[in-house]
């Protein structure tokens, strides 16, 4: 515990930091600047905080997002006054949309130096609009004990709001008067003699912040689900802190209902395939056969989290409008299709635990939940089981599950055979090869645009326990490299799959190389432009397509890597790539560039993605 009694600002900032560390903070990302000096000094000198200096604010924010996403705990992000904080904005949007806890601390000038052209001053109050979970401006630092208590409790509340009821960013605007440096001030001597640190911080522990009570559970119609003979589970993109428990819970639900499970590639489910015998990975390709898609129409869909990326799947659901139940504990609206939907504000793990408990107690799974009751012993809302005699369960139709299983088997075999025999450097094969070649448990960050879609199309199920990571909150390409480095920092050796434009958009992330602890291999699909635009109608209009949409940059990545002292290799064959991935290094950053033909790859997709279904199951 360290309270810096040199002056008013050092006392204030060190109490702020000490409060955060007692709540559980371990990492702070600090951008250089003058006005944030008290915060930087406090974080940098605290023995329990890993303080990481990063030059570029946008890169810093995405790196912090990556660290927070991996750990599940808030990361502090500090900058000086002026436009510095504006560069955090893209990562704050992503943090809100993808539910990542961040604590944004923007230093500011005091009120008397605003709106008077005092320099490096903008309006930072509510700088990030409605994206933070909570935001406030702290008082100007003071030595009065009541104000120090106010600071402590405000920081506790900020920590809580970054985590509950739904994780996301919190913004504290922090004004400081001069002197900003830790210049000694005799005025703090009296406070130092009276300050009882252990008493002041006695109640500040991780246990002092409790989750908010869960939102009241809706009626969970388990009996209705079990009675349905054309039910389906769709598991969308997910980055759970405990991927195995997440996959086990979904497996329990799927097998207890005998529902096929459509599993997004940006989910750990495909990498714990042994847990889920009803897993369907080729749904996008299956649904391209419109006659077969009609035969597979469900009457009921249980959606776990957000929908998968697939446009084919979304269009199919939108066309047939089945009743949908969305299982997710967050308070967001997760129905982008505006269908016949009921949100169930509960985690899939809670439902999986309920199923396990009933099996353990030899009760019939399927008894279902009914209206909520409050357990008066702990005031936690609990589901109540419907009595066995009240159940009405009709026999399930095994043919619906078999139709999906047969289609999956046929198309999976066709995709795997096609990919295995493909000699050319087609960018989609990179995603398939990663599913076959990465060491078990490898953290894999997947960039937006075509990489996420290639993973959904081609990623083959297995038991590798690979954990996919991504920025699909706002779906932008900004911060790709920096986020991946944040995921990989002090983690198992990691891999990133990215296109050339996404990497170029964040090359300042390479400046992290001298502070980065761990290893990241970057699989760079270089098709010299935006490959995803080749899949859109605008690609037929030339000009302006190539110059203004594909935007080729003609970059020599070997020279770029040399500038940043990053290892580089050009990939000439799939066998070479497999060898380089079989055992990942433990330190540093390396780029493995796969040169591809953007237009040839787009033509291949247009020709082949709809041709894998040869016969109906």
What are these model-predicted stretches?
Residues 26-29, 50-52, 70-109, 297-305, ...:
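A short, small-residue-rich loop immediately preceding and capping a beta-strand
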Residues 106-158, 263-362, 390, 394-407, ...:
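Glycine-rich, acidic loop regions that bind phosphate or pyrophosphate groups
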Residues 87, 220-223, 235-325, 333, ...:
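Glycine-rich, anion-gripping cofactor-binding loops and their flanking helix/strand elements
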Residues 105, 112-126, 432, 459-616:
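Thiamine diphosphate
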Residues 13-17, 21-24, 34-35, 39-40, ...:
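Active-site diphosphate/adenylate-binding microenvironment
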Residues 5-94:
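N-terminal cofactor/phosphate-binding cores enriched in small/glycine residues
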Residues 2-8, 316-365, 379, 383-452, ...:
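Phosphate/pyrophosphate-binding active-site segments
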Residues 166-169, 173-214, 581-617:
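Glycine/aspartate-rich loop-and-adjacent alpha/beta segment that forms the canonical ThDP
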């Amino acid at each position: 515990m360290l309270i810096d009694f040199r002056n008013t600002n050092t006392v204030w900032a060190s109490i702020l930091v000490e409060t955060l560390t007692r709540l559980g903070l371990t990492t702070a990302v600090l951008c250089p600047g003058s006005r944030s000096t008290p915060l930087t000094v406090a974080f940098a000198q605290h023995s329990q905080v890993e303080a990481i200096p990063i030059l570029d604010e946008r890169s810093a924010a995405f790196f912090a997002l990556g660290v927070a996403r991996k750990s599940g705990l808030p990361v502090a992000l500090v900058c000086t006054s002026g436009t510095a904080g504006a560069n955090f904005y893209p990562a704050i949007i992503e943090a809100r949309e993808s539910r990542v806890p961040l604590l944004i601390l923007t230093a500011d000038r005091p009120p008397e130096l605003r709106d008077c052209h005092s320099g490096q001053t903008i309006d930072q109050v509510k700088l990030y609009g409605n994206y933070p979970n909570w935001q406030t401006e702290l008082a100007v630092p003071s030595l009065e004990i009541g104000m120090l208590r106010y600071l402590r409790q405000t920081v506790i509340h900020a920590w809580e709001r970054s985590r509950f009821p739904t994780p996301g960013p919190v913004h504290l605007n922090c004004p400081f008067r001069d002197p900003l440096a830790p210049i000694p001030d005799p005025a703090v001597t009296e406070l130092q003699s009276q300050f009882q640190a252990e008493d002041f911080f006695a109640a500040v522990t991780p246990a002092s912040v409790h989750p908010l009570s869960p939102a009241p559970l809706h009626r969970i119609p388990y009996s209705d689900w079990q009675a349905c003979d054309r039910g389906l589970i769709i598991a969308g993109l997910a980055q759970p802190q405990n991927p195995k428990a997440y996959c086990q819970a979904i497996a329990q639900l799927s097998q207890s209902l005998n529902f096929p499970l459509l599993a997004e590639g940006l989910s750990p489910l495909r990498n714990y395939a042994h847990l889920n015998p009803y897993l369907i990975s080729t749904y996008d390709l299956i649904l391209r056969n419109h006659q077969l898609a009609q035969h597979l129409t469900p009457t009921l869909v249980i959606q776990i989290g957000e929908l998968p990326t697939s446009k084919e799947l979304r269009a199919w659901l939108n066309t047939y409008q089945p009743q949908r139940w969305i299982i997710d504990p967050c308070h967001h609206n997760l129905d982008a299709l505006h269908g016949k939907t009921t949100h169930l504000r509960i985690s899939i793990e809670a439902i999986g635990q309920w199923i396990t408990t009933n099996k353990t107690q030899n009760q019939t799974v399927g008894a279902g939940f009914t209206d909520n009751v409050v357990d008066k012993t702990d005031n936690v809302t609990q589901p109540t089981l419907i009595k066995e005699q009240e159940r009405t369960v009709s026999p399930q139709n095994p043919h619906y599950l078999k139709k999906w299983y047969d289609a999956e088997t046929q198309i999976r075999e066709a995709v795997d055979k096609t990919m295995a025999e493909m000699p050319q450097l087609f960018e989609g094969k990179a995603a398939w090869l990663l599913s076959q070649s990465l060491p078990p448990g490898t953290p894999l960050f997947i960039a937006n645009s075509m990489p996420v879609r290639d993973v959904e199309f081609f990623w083959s199920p297995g038991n590798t326990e690979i954990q996919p990571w991504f920025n699909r909150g706002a779906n932008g390409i900004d911060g790709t490299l920096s986020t991946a480095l944040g995921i990989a920092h002090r983690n198992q050796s990691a891999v990133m799959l990215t296109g050339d434009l996404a990497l170029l958009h964040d090359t300042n992330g390479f400046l992290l190389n001298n502070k980065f602890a761990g290893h990241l291999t970057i699989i760079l699909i270089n098709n010299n432009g935006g490959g995803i635009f080749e899949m859109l109608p605008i690609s037929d209009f030339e000009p302006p397509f190539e110059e203004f949409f594909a935007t080729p940059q003609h970059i020599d990545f070997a020279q770029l890597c040399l500038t940043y002292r990053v290892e580089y290799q050009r990939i000439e064959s799939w066998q070479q790539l497999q060898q380089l991935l079989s055992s990942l290094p433990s330190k540093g950053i390396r780029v493995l560039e796969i040169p591809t033909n953007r237009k040839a790859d787009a033509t291949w997709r247009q020709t082949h993605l709809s041709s894998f279904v040869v016969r109906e199951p």
